[in-house]
Protein backbone atom coordinates (compact mmCIF):
# COMPACT_ATOMS: atom_id res chain seq x y z
CA UNK A 1 0.00 0.00 0.00
CA UNK A 2 1.37 3.39 -0.94
CA UNK A 3 -0.10 6.87 -1.29
CA UNK A 4 -0.69 7.93 -4.84
CA UNK A 5 -2.60 10.24 -7.08
CA UNK A 6 -1.19 12.94 -9.29
CA UNK A 7 -0.51 15.45 -6.51
CA UNK A 8 1.19 12.91 -4.26
CA UNK A 9 3.23 11.57 -7.19
CA UNK A 10 4.38 15.08 -8.18
CA UNK A 11 5.34 15.72 -4.55
CA UNK A 12 7.28 12.46 -4.39
CA UNK A 13 9.24 13.21 -7.59
CA UNK A 14 10.11 16.78 -6.55
CA UNK A 15 11.25 15.53 -3.13
CA UNK A 16 13.43 12.86 -4.79
CA UNK A 17 15.09 15.64 -6.81
CA UNK A 18 15.92 17.55 -3.64
CA UNK A 19 13.39 20.31 -4.30
CA UNK A 20 11.60 21.61 -1.19
CA UNK A 21 7.93 20.72 -1.59
CA UNK A 22 4.80 20.92 0.54
CA UNK A 23 1.65 18.98 -0.31
CA UNK A 24 -1.74 20.53 0.48
CA UNK A 25 -4.82 18.45 -0.07
CA UNK A 26 -8.31 17.55 1.09
CA UNK A 27 -8.96 14.02 2.29
CA UNK A 28 -11.87 12.08 3.74
CA UNK A 29 -11.78 11.89 7.51
CA UNK A 30 -12.95 8.24 7.67
CA UNK A 31 -9.49 6.94 6.79
CA UNK A 32 -7.33 10.07 6.74
CA UNK A 33 -5.06 8.64 9.45
CA UNK A 34 -4.00 5.85 7.09
CA UNK A 35 -3.01 8.44 4.47
CA UNK A 36 -1.17 10.52 7.06
CA UNK A 37 0.75 7.45 8.19
CA UNK A 38 1.78 6.60 4.63
CA UNK A 39 2.88 10.19 3.92
CA UNK A 40 4.82 10.28 7.21
CA UNK A 41 6.47 6.96 6.35
CA UNK A 42 7.60 8.44 3.03
CA UNK A 43 8.87 11.67 4.61
CA UNK A 44 6.38 13.87 2.75
CA UNK A 45 5.76 17.35 4.16
CA UNK A 46 2.01 17.90 3.95
CA UNK A 47 -1.13 19.54 5.25
CA UNK A 48 -4.35 17.61 4.84
CA UNK A 49 -7.70 19.30 5.27
CA UNK A 50 -10.55 17.04 6.30
CA UNK A 51 -13.91 16.50 4.64
CA UNK A 52 -16.68 13.94 5.07
CA UNK A 53 -16.14 10.53 3.52
CA UNK A 54 -13.15 8.30 2.90
CA UNK A 55 -9.92 8.82 0.99
CA UNK A 56 -10.33 7.30 -2.45
CA UNK A 57 -8.62 3.94 -2.77
CA UNK A 58 -7.64 2.69 -6.21
CA UNK A 59 -6.61 -0.83 -7.05
CA UNK A 60 -3.96 -1.92 -9.54
CA UNK A 61 -3.73 -5.59 -10.50
CA UNK A 62 -0.56 -6.87 -12.17
CA UNK A 63 -1.08 -10.09 -14.12
CA UNK A 64 1.59 -12.82 -14.42
CA UNK A 65 2.35 -11.57 -17.95
CA UNK A 66 3.00 -8.08 -16.46
CA UNK A 67 -0.10 -6.33 -17.75
CA UNK A 68 -1.55 -3.79 -15.35
CA UNK A 69 -5.24 -3.15 -14.81
CA UNK A 70 -6.26 -0.21 -12.67
CA UNK A 71 -9.61 0.41 -11.05
CA UNK A 72 -9.93 4.13 -10.29
CA UNK A 73 -12.79 4.95 -7.98
CA UNK A 74 -14.54 8.31 -8.05
CA UNK A 75 -13.40 10.96 -5.60
CA UNK A 76 -15.57 12.25 -2.79
CA UNK A 77 -17.53 15.50 -2.59
CA UNK A 78 -15.72 18.31 -0.78
CA UNK A 79 -17.43 20.13 2.07
CA UNK A 80 -17.65 23.91 1.61
CA UNK A 81 -15.66 24.56 4.78
CA UNK A 82 -12.77 22.37 3.55
CA UNK A 83 -12.85 24.02 0.11
CA UNK A 84 -12.77 27.50 1.68
CA UNK A 85 -9.90 26.41 3.94
CA UNK A 86 -7.97 25.23 0.89
CA UNK A 87 -7.99 28.80 -0.50
CA UNK A 88 -6.52 30.07 2.79
CA UNK A 89 -3.96 27.26 3.10
CA UNK A 90 -2.58 27.73 -0.41
CA UNK A 91 -2.30 31.51 0.13
CA UNK A 92 -0.38 30.96 3.40
CA UNK A 93 2.16 28.66 1.73
CA UNK A 94 3.24 31.21 -0.88
CA UNK A 95 6.68 32.72 -0.31
CA UNK A 96 6.05 36.48 -0.62
CA UNK A 97 9.57 37.48 -1.69
CA UNK A 98 10.57 34.31 -3.51
CA UNK A 99 9.63 32.20 -6.48
CA UNK A 100 6.70 29.83 -6.12
CA UNK A 101 5.62 26.93 -8.30
CA UNK A 102 2.14 25.67 -7.50
CA UNK A 103 1.03 22.44 -9.14
CA UNK A 104 -2.67 21.71 -9.55
CA UNK A 105 -3.08 18.06 -10.42
CA UNK A 106 -5.68 15.36 -10.43
CA UNK A 107 -9.36 15.02 -11.02
CA UNK A 108 -12.16 17.43 -10.27
CA UNK A 109 -14.12 16.66 -7.09
CA UNK A 110 -17.69 15.70 -8.05
CA UNK A 111 -19.27 18.78 -6.45
CA UNK A 112 -16.70 21.37 -7.55
CA UNK A 113 -17.08 22.98 -10.96
CA UNK A 114 -14.16 23.73 -13.27
CA UNK A 115 -15.08 27.43 -12.89
CA UNK A 116 -14.77 27.20 -9.09
CA UNK A 117 -11.45 25.36 -9.36
CA UNK A 118 -10.26 28.04 -11.78
CA UNK A 119 -11.23 30.68 -9.20
CA UNK A 120 -8.91 28.96 -6.69
CA UNK A 121 -6.05 29.06 -9.17
CA UNK A 122 -6.62 32.68 -10.18
CA UNK A 123 -6.73 33.70 -6.50
CA UNK A 124 -3.00 32.99 -6.17
CA UNK A 125 -1.82 34.39 -9.49
CA UNK A 126 0.99 36.87 -8.88
CA UNK A 127 4.23 37.75 -10.70
CA UNK A 128 6.25 35.43 -8.42
CA UNK A 129 3.84 32.47 -8.70
CA UNK A 130 4.11 29.99 -11.55
CA UNK A 131 1.16 27.68 -12.13
CA UNK A 132 1.52 24.11 -13.41
CA UNK A 133 -1.56 22.16 -14.52
CA UNK A 134 -1.94 18.40 -14.76
CA UNK A 135 -5.71 18.11 -15.03
CA UNK A 136 -8.20 17.09 -17.70
CA UNK A 137 -11.28 19.16 -16.95
CA UNK A 138 -10.47 22.69 -18.10
CA UNK A 139 -11.57 23.89 -21.50
CA UNK A 140 -9.11 25.46 -23.90
CA UNK A 141 -10.46 28.94 -23.10
CA UNK A 142 -10.20 28.33 -19.34
CA UNK A 143 -6.58 27.26 -19.72
CA UNK A 144 -5.86 30.41 -21.73
CA UNK A 145 -7.37 32.49 -18.94
CA UNK A 146 -5.33 30.69 -16.27
CA UNK A 147 -2.19 31.14 -18.41
CA UNK A 148 -0.18 28.38 -16.70
CA UNK A 149 3.59 28.28 -16.76
CA UNK A 150 3.37 24.64 -17.81
CA UNK A 151 0.64 22.17 -18.69
CA UNK A 152 1.13 18.41 -19.03
CA UNK A 153 -1.73 16.80 -20.88
CA UNK A 154 -1.53 13.28 -22.20
CA UNK A 155 -3.33 12.59 -25.49
CA UNK A 156 -6.67 11.77 -23.82
CA UNK A 157 -6.46 14.95 -21.76
CA UNK A 158 -5.53 16.93 -24.88
CA UNK A 159 -8.66 15.56 -26.57
CA UNK A 160 -10.74 16.81 -23.64
CA UNK A 161 -9.09 20.24 -23.77
CA UNK A 162 -9.67 20.52 -27.52
CA UNK A 163 -13.19 19.04 -27.26
CA UNK A 164 -12.59 16.45 -29.95
CA UNK A 165 -11.37 12.90 -30.27
CA UNK A 166 -8.77 11.36 -32.51
CA UNK A 167 -6.31 14.22 -32.30
CA UNK A 168 -2.77 13.82 -33.54
CA UNK A 169 0.49 14.94 -32.01
CA UNK A 170 0.47 17.75 -34.58
CA UNK A 171 -2.95 18.89 -33.25
CA UNK A 172 -1.62 18.86 -29.70
CA UNK A 173 1.48 20.86 -30.66
CA UNK A 174 -0.69 23.36 -32.52
CA UNK A 175 -2.88 23.82 -29.47
CA UNK A 176 0.22 24.18 -27.29
CA UNK A 177 1.48 26.94 -29.58
CA UNK A 178 -1.83 28.78 -29.23
CA UNK A 179 -1.68 28.46 -25.45
CA UNK A 180 1.91 29.73 -25.42
CA UNK A 181 0.86 32.83 -27.33
CA UNK A 182 -1.84 33.67 -24.76
For each feature predicted by the language model, list its residue ranges:
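Conserved phosphate/ATP/ADP-binding segment of small-molecule kinases
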Residues: 115-182
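Cofactor-binding loop segments of dinucleotide-utilizing enzymes, especially the Rossmann-like FAD-
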Residues: 25-29, 51, 64, 73, ...
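Conserved phosphate-binding/catalytic loop of the ribokinase/pfkB sugar-kinase fold
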Residues: 60-97
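Short beta-strands and strand-loop turn motifs
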Residues: 70-72, 99-107, 134, 152-157
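Substrate-binding N-lobe of the ribokinase-like
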Residues: 1-56
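Short, small-residue-enriched loops and turns at beta-alpha junctions
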Residues: 76-79, 108-112, 139-141, 160
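Short acidic/histidine-rich motifs immediately flanking catalytic phosphotransfer sites
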Residues: 96-101, 147
Amino acid sequence: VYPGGKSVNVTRVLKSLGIPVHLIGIAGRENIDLLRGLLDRDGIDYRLLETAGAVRENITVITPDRRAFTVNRQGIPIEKQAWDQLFISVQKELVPDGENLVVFAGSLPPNISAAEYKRLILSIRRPNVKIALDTDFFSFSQIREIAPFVIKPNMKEAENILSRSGITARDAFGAASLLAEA
